[in-house]
Amino acid sequence: MKRLAVVAVVTLVMLGCTASGDHTPVTGPVTVQAAGKKADAPREMKAFVSEQELRNYLRELAEREKKQRPAQISGAVGMDKLAPSAPMSAKSEAMAGSAPDANESVTNVQHAGVDEGGIVKVHGDQLVVLRRGRLFTVEIGGDELTPISMVDAYGPDIDPRGTWYDEMLVSQNTVVVIGYSYERGGTEVGMFHIDGAGKLAFRATYHLRSNDYYSSRNYAGRLIGNKLIFYSPLYVNPWSEDPFQSFPAVRKWHKGATPGEFKRIEPAARAYRPAYPFDVAYGTALHTVTTCDLSSGDFDCTATSVVGPPGRVFYVSPRAVYVWVTGGAYVGEKMRARSMVYRMPLDGSSPSAVGVSGSPVDQFSFLESEDGYLNVLVRSNDVGDGMWGAENSRGGVKLLRMPVSSFSDGSEPVDESSYLKLPTPGGYTFENRFVGDYLLYGTGSGWGYPQARGKATLYAVRWASGDVHRVPLAHGIDRIEQMGSDAVVVGVDGADLHFSAVRLEGTPQEVCDYVRKNASQGEMRSHGFFYKPQDRDSGMLGLPISVPGRPGYYNLFQNSAAILFLRNRGLRFEEVGELGAQPEKAKDDGCRASCVDWYGNAQPLFVHGRVIALLGYELVEGEVEDGVIHETRRVNYAPRNLTASREWDESGVPN
């Protein structure tokens, strides 16, 4: 389904939502039993030994699908429907920590050292910006704030219509633009060279077979060192004359390129099947992790796939990609569980799996913790985070905590004792985040119209012990972010925007509620926020803001009014001020592609000791004096208006 068509549907759904919740009482601490599976259970999933075996398996799935089509089907699997299995092993393996990134980052990532595709990155003394189908570089070395280079975010022989150029990553002298092409079919990867002076040059375009990866919360690409990582579902037609035509493959684009030029990058030996059967009534997907080595400057890729139902949420830790698939159904009157989580190691070793129930809300529902456990918040009626799936999260809430060592071939489900029943919040749009030793969650307005709730509850769960705390707030919960060793919760109460500082040491509690009158969030995605710590107890945060009462989905079509900066001093907020946009000076940019800001258009940048606001085509720099930020200059890097000026110097600065 094309994205613009989905926007209208999602908007109608959001306008029609009402608050609900059963307010489940707090339960005791989660207990993980020892001994996980049969002693002789395989530790990994089974790969296909030949192309013929894989073909036969797909034919079997086709026959099963044919038999199930007449059956009554319902969408999600209840979390309480899995039969308990033998207890799990308490053995855990040592986990790699989230090592800090050696390079300065301007991206609010989930794990340090695991970069995520975004709209702005740092390359040495340059900012690289992806905006509306074009790439831009801006010099920030020394005292500079000067546009340098601009190129289309696609090849010179490509018609960009029907393609969304969504996100970007930078590895040494390579800029990678990730998009999805409805015209050419699949993930489109543009590779560009960037030199030390920030000059951009197109290198090549490649296509990866995939279905649309878009998620309102997640990001398609990750970068760990020089390793580029993609997740994508590939929906398989087992009835096809050639079922392999939808398998992972790469094509280097050139004018006149044909589908026959795709070259498979995954042999049968890198395709895996779970021992635990799944329902094929909703179809079959190859959940594919593609890894590309960028160290040579080429696009050398390999892929690994696991077969499963189509609903999914994926999460990337420093060690593995986790893919949670959901495809449960009623057959007659009997509920059968068909949820599973796959673990696909980044070192290239074989995937493993385990049967589970329910579904996470989004990638922030996961944490692979240092003690060798996978911790996941699940809801009973979720179907994954594809498109706007995360905005329609429903059902009871549980915390799954299981040893990573309990993954095997998928033949056994997780023991019921590994799930902790949690309170279900009232409200609509569900937000969750692991911060320090706690899982935090609650509900807010999300992409809909701001609600005047007056009060809400933030639930704080100590994931290792299961202790649950309720933190009352005077506003909804639309954003949960880490702030040092504590958290900041952002949300609206009608026309006002609130920032609540939550102390997590000892008993979690709200310390400060800073209210920005007559404002709303200008960005909904995680990358719109950034916190720059100064020391353990202080720092500065930035967040795009907009006019009061603006629904969240408006950020797809309207720019933010400003970026608001707050100083944190011991969990007490002080307003530093804002750097604002000048929309009256905007000019037609001649946009040809990606003319909707699916991934946002504003972001605070704390870089090279400077404070800069990215606001559409404007970069606005500020200087903090006596606790107040003052604009010092702005540059408009738009393709038809490459001008710069200092507030104190009307003569301007030459490009």
List each language-model region with its residue ranges.
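Positively charged n-region of N-terminal signal peptides that target proteins for export
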Residues: 1-4
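Short amphipathic alpha-helical "recognition" segments used for binding
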Residues: 6-7, 120
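Bacterial N-terminal signal peptides
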Residues: 7-16
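Beta-sheet-rich non-transmembrane sensory/scaffold domains
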Residues: 17-655
